[in-house]
Amino acid sequence: MNTTATQLVPAAALPKQLLRDMRAAQHRIWLQAMEFHSEGPAMQALLEAACAAAARGVKVRLVCDPHSYANQPSIGRVVRQLQRAGVAVDWCGHGWWGWPVAGRSHVKIYCCDDTVYLGGGVNFSQASFANHDFMLRYRSAEVANRALGAAHNLYSWWARPDYAVAVSATDTLLADGGTRGQSIILEQACALVRNAKRVWYVSQFAPSGRLASLLRRSQAEVVAFNTARTATSLLDAVGYRALNYRFQAHNQYLGDRKIHAKYIVAEQADGRLVSLTGSHNFNATGVRFGTQETAILTHDQSLGQQLISYARQLV
């Protein structure tokens, strides 16, 4: 598989980099995230670029979870404007009627021709660009095609099987299809921590269940997740208190900026690094609700070192 070096793009730098890629695109643009909010200067520039690309014949598709309708009265008007400009807008997820947090699509994939962003948690919104977060940028037709294949496979009102597919010589894309109680990503996280000599853990939420037990017994160099202090809404504050309190004594994060990155780096007995990074928060709550997720399992040593440096900067 031919691929260039993977680039870690911080959330703050993503709008400008993605905008350049969108403006250069000649064939396809795929923008997928759980949350889509159109307000803000960076988002306005990105949406204008999407419309301009559609006008020059590029196939442009925006895919997001219906959760985006929450607290955003103008979204119907924005969607109609995008559709009139030639941008296809689709809604994904497989929610259960009457239970709004179930069956959500938490996937983040951005693709412009053969450049694709994976393995991070950045939503398609102005507020998301201010979080501690990132995306991994690949420049490879093979990686882009396989990532979009995964996106199409997950695009269903019904839960899909979990699966894994190699996207490069060092990287494998893992996908949770949304079956309640089942997560190939969480299983892989447990396997990494169980066999690790040292561990670096960063997430929006504390680990739970078996992963939490394994992490307590591991040599954890960095453990960083949010507290109620970093909450940007009442719902966030309640969620952090409810999901993080049992593991709070192990938390090393003292900052005020929201952590939205989600990854684990595990040092093996031979000193090599294996990393797992993506949209999964490593908390079993989303698994019980049947959330669709994607993550990258990578043996790239340079990327592993970048992720360790990122974790150290948080504490």
Task: Give the predicted meaning of each segment.
Residues M1-D90, W96-V315:
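Charged, low-complexity intrinsically disordered terminal segments
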